[in-house]
Amino acid sequence: MRLTILAVLLLALAACARGKPEPEKAHVDVSISELQFGPSTVLEQTWLLTLRIQNPNNYDIPADGMKYQIDVNGKFFARGVNNQSVMVPRLGEAMIQVQAVSDLPTLIQHFGDLRRLSQTGINYYMNGMLYSGEWRYPFEYSGAVTPVQ
C-alpha cells in the first residue's frame, strides 16, 4: 500500500514538473520599439528604450528583470539592466521602458565619422536575458537604419 501511495505521489510531482517546457526550449522575442536620448553628461550618455516583449509560449511569464547589450555596426555601444516586474501574457506581449548607458569614448568611436554613417547606414544588434524567478529567457534582436537616397 505504501509503495502504491509513493508511486502516485511521484507521478503527480512529475506531472507538475512537466507543466512548462525546459527553459532552453522556451523563448521570448524582444524588440526595440522606441529609442530616445535621455539625461546625460559629457562622459556618460543615457538612452531611453521602449522594448516590446512578445511571449510565443502557452503560459504567462512573470518577468522580474532583464539585462541587455546593444552593438552598433558590430561593436559594443551600450548596456543596461532592469529589475521592473512585468507580466507577459501567454501568446501576448508587454511593453517596458528601460535605460541603457554608453560612455564618451564609445560614442566617439561610433559617431566620429557621421559622413560615412550617413552613406552606409547603421546596423544594430541587441542581446540579453529576461529573468522570471529561476528561469532565464535569452533573446536577440537586430535591425538596420538605412540612409535615405
Where are these regions (language model features)?
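Sec-dependent signal peptide recognition
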Residues: 2-8
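C-terminal motif of bacterial Sec signal peptides marking the signal peptidase cleavage site
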Residues: 12-15
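Bacterial signal peptide processing site
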Residues: 17-20
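Post-signal-peptide N-terminal segment of Sec-exported extracytoplasmic proteins
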Residues: 25-75, 132, 136-138
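Short structured motifs
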Residues: 31-37, 80-84, 109-113
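Intrinsic-disorder/low-complexity, polar/charged segments enriched in Ser/Thr/Lys/Arg/Asp/Glu/Gln
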Residues: 44-48, 93-97, 123-125, 140
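Intrinsically disordered, low-complexity Pro/Gly/Ser/Thr-rich segments with frequent PxxP/GP/PP motifs
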Residues: 75-109
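Terminal connector regions
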Residues: 104-149
